UniProtKB/Swiss-Prot annotation:
Propeptide: 22-33, 69-74
Protein name: Antimicrobial peptide HsAp4
Signal peptide bounds: 1-21
UniProt note on tissues of expression: Expressed by the venom gland.
Length: 74
């Protein structure tokens, strides 16, 4: 892999971890508290990471809200 690809991969990984950390500090609703009572910390962390990755994918697929992605217009 080229240095550029490695750098991009590292930066995206750091962004995902940072966003997951920010998400974990948000106020939890009663539903989330009930849901978390039966799950381990590792499961919660992986769930947060998956949620962040899904949001990033949605953001890359349609970068401008209210407009469809270019691939969907054709």
């Amino acid at each position: 892999m080229s240095r550029r690809r490695i750098l991009i991969l590292v930066l995206v990984t750091m962004l995902v971890k940072t966003m997951a950390g920010m998400e974990s500090k948000w106020v939890e609703t009663t539903y989330e508290i009930k849901k978390r009572s039966g799950t381990s910390e590792k499961e919660r962390e992986s769930g947060r990471l998956l949620g962040v990755v899904k949001r990033l994918i949605v953001g890359f697929r349609s970068p401008f809200r209210g407009r469809r992605a270019i691939s969907e217009q054709t």
